[in-house]
Amino acid sequence: MKSNETGRFGENEACRYLESRGYGILMRNYRSRYGEIDIVAAKDGAVVFVEVKARRDRAFAEAAQAVGPSKQEKLRKTALCWFAEYGEQPARFDVLEIYTGTARRTAFGEAYRTEIRHIKNAF
């Protein structure tokens, strides 16, 4: 799986995961001049800004480590733009780590063993 495919696969898996846990997906890939928020979701009266980090494995580092101070600042500024457009509400920032593992062939094509780690209130 190529890196852009891994990202798309990760975001799709993240949406399925969130919906299965009662989150409503408000939008995907919200963009502002500061950056992009992968998923904007809602649960229990709060907006949840979700950064998805998809990796094939944990060989180098945990995926959430890629959400450092600079990325957090961009996400906060982008969230402020979202609030300016849609109105302020209680909110939090979550990170979803998606590890796709290695592919195995099945009768229906390739299948991936996916592991998901949800970090609520990540920053």
Language model features: what each stretch is:
Residues 33-35:
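Short acidic/glycine-enriched loop/turn segments that link adjacent beta-strands
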Residues 60-91:
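Mid-chain, well-packed structural core segment of small domains
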Residues 85-123:
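Domain-level recognition of nuclease-like catalytic cores that cleave nucleotide substrates
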Residues 18, 37-63, 67, 75:
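Conserved catalytic cores of phosphodiester-cleaving nucleases, focusing on short active-site segments
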Residues 29, 53, 94-96:
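Solvent-exposed beta-strand sheet faces enriched in polar/charged residues
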Residues 1-28:
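Acidic-basic catalytic patches of nuclease active cores, encompassing PD-(D/E)XK
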Residues 24, 47, 90:
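Hydrophobic "anchor" residues on beta-strands that sit immediately upstream
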